[in-house]
A protein has these predicted regions:
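PLP-dependent amino-acid enzyme catalytic core
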Residues: 2-354
């Protein structure tokens, strides 16, 4: 695999501790489809594609580090891309309020982007959202509306509340769960960027699925560019993305891996372009994320851990494979969960991975 025409060199000599020395990889990527003069927002995208620094005993494994975005996740692309698209078609103008329902990475991304572009924003969050997450979003100046934990069809639910606030304040509700701009941003941006970095030399892309927008957009782009590249979505074991994909009976939605899985299919999941969906249980996702940090110096969250686990399975079965994993976010948000031994032991998960 080459990056923007530059050769990849791997030193055959092992360094300290038997690890293989690798030279830095230089990449050239296309310009962002959502250009900005803001120096902070200009850092969104063009994230590095690195060779995963651990043997897979099979195919080659690469990791796209979306953690290099300003708020540490791929949701920065979503936020900037959707806001720019809304501005371009006149649906978002000066003085408008941007509203979204999220307590995770999207909340931080929306808060940052609206802050830098001069829009007010309101984030609705479910009760029990950690003070750290609320504080992070507020640090960029967003309003927070905390909502009770009720059924999704209850008017007090945090998504219903976001929709209502947007209507009352004549604002824009981003609605990442059904907004077709979600996968479109990745079709226009992440897919082409990945293709150029890999110089088209890849056999698989493995991507965690929450809203499904990233996997769907990348899959559509690759289907048009090189149809034999397989895009593999990754679902939580106790989730219903895979059951919706394969048309099998759905079950309960119960996972502790943030940003992975959903209780049902969403409009942002373009299944017609995705080749397969594999499920990973919470324990394996967390253990793989911890291994990535301890053994490889790569700090990612549980959803990326799940994707790395799937990619390693593919690599073992396909020695000729060249697999890109989308690393959705940084692990620095999970020091009190995934990387906390006490938290892991309370749930019966092993901690001898490091």
């Amino acid at each position: 695999m080459t990056d923007g025409g530059s050769d990849t060199h791997v030193d055959d000599a092992a360094g300290d501790g038997g690890r293989v020395k690798r030279e830095a990889r230089v990449t050239e990527t296309p310009e962002s489809p959502y250009p900005t003069d803001d120096p902070v927002l200009a850092r969104i995208g063009d994230t590095p594609l690195i060779e995963y620094p651990e043997s897979t005993d099979g195919g080659d494994l690469f990791l796209k580090l979306e953690s290099d975005n300003p708020t540490g996740s791929m949701k920065d692309r979503l936020a900037l891309g959707i806001v720019r698209e809304l501005e371009a078609d006149g649906r978002l103008t000066d003085g408008d309020v941007v509203v979204e329902a999220s307590s995770g990475n999207t909340a931080g991304a929306i808060s940052l982007v609206t802050n830098r572009l001069g829009y007010d924003s309101v984030l609705t969050v479910p009760a029990g959202t950690s003070p750290q997450k609320i504080g992070y979003v507020r640090s960029f100046g967003s309003e927070i509306a905390e909502c009770p934990n009720v059924d999704a069809d209850d008017e007090r639910h945090y998504r219903k509340t976001a929709e209502r606030i947007a209507a009352e304040r004549d604002g824009i509700w981003i609605d990442q769960y059904s907004n077709q701009l979600n996968p479109t941003v990745h079709y226009e941006w992440t897919g082409p960027e990945l293709w150029d970095q890999a110089a088209g030399d890849l056999t698989h892309v493995v991507c965690p699925m929450g809203t499904g927008g990233t996997a769907s957009g990348i899959a559509k782009f690759l289907t048009e560019r090189k149809p034999d590249v397989r895009v593999v979505g990754v679902d939580a074991e106790e989730s219903n993305i895979s059951t919706a994909f394969y048309g099998t009976e759905s079950g309960a939605y119960d996972t502790e891996v943030e940003g992975l899985g959903k209780g049902h299919e969403l409009p942002t999941m373009w299944f017609e372009y995705v080749d397969e969906v594999r499920s990973v249980d919470d324990e394996r996702a967390f253990v793989q994320a911890r291994r990535a940090a301890a053994e490889c110096g790569v700090l990612v969250g549980g959803s990326s851990g799940a994707a790395i686990a799937v990619a390693r399975d593919i690599a073992r079965d396909r020695p000729d494979a060249k697999i890109v994993v989308i690393g959705c976010d940084s692990g620095d948000q999970y020091f009190d969960t995934v990387f906390d031994d006490a938290w892991m032991r309370e749930r019966g998960y092993p901690t001898d991975d490091r």
